[in-house]
A protein has these predicted regions:
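Intrinsically disordered, low-complexity activation-like regions
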Residues: 2-134
C-alpha cells in the first residue's frame, strides 16, 4: 500500500485537493515504519503549506493533460479543507510520537498477537491515551 501511496503522490500530488490528500495520506499515518511516518509528516506539511496562512485565497489545481473533459480548475475558497488539515495535525503528531517511542502502535498488540512491554501497558493505561485510537 505504501508503494502505491508514494507513486500516487509522485504522479498526482499537484492535482489533489485537501480531502483527496487526506485520503491518500492515511497509509503514511497508520504505518508502523518510522521512515514512512517521517515521509508522511513531510507530505502533510507540504500540503498544509500550499494553503499558507490565508486559507481563503485562490489555489489552482493544474491538470497536465488539459482536455475539454478534464481541465484545470481554480478553487476560490477552501477554508474547510484548510481547517480539516489543521484538525489532522495533532493526530499526525500523535501517531508519529507513538512510533518514535515504541516502534509500533501498542494498541494493535492484541489484534496482532504481540505481547505488550511494561512501558506499552503503562502507556495504554493512561486516561488520555485511552480516549484516542493510537
Amino acid at each position: 500500500v505504501l508503494i502505491f501511496c508514494e507513486l500516487g503522490f509522485e504522479l498526482y500530488r499537484d492535482q489533489l485537493n485537501g480531502y483527496e490528500f487526506m485520503f491518500a495520506f492515511m497509509p503514511y499515518m497508520h504505518t508502523e515504519s518510522l521512515l514512512y511516518q517521517r515521509k508522511g509528516e513531510t507530505q502533510f506539511f507540504n500540503q498544509k503549506n500550499l494553503y499558507g496562512t490565508n486559507p481563503g485565497k485562490t489555489k489552482s489545481l493544474r491538470n497536465p493533460n488539459d482536455t475539454p473533459f478534464m481541465t484545470s480548475i481554480e478553487l476560490t475558497n477552501y477554508d474547510k479543507e484548510y481547517e480539516m488539515l489543521k484538525s489532522m495535525e495533532p493526530h499526525l503528531k500523535g501517531h508519529l510520537e507513538v512510533i518514535q517511542g515504541f516502534g509500533r502502535f501498542p494498541k494493535r498488540n492484541v489484534a496482532l498477537g504481540r505481547e505488550s512491554t511494561s512501558s506499552e501497558i503503562k502507556y495504554m493505561e493512561s486516561p488520555e491515551v485511552q480516549k484516542r485510537p493510537y
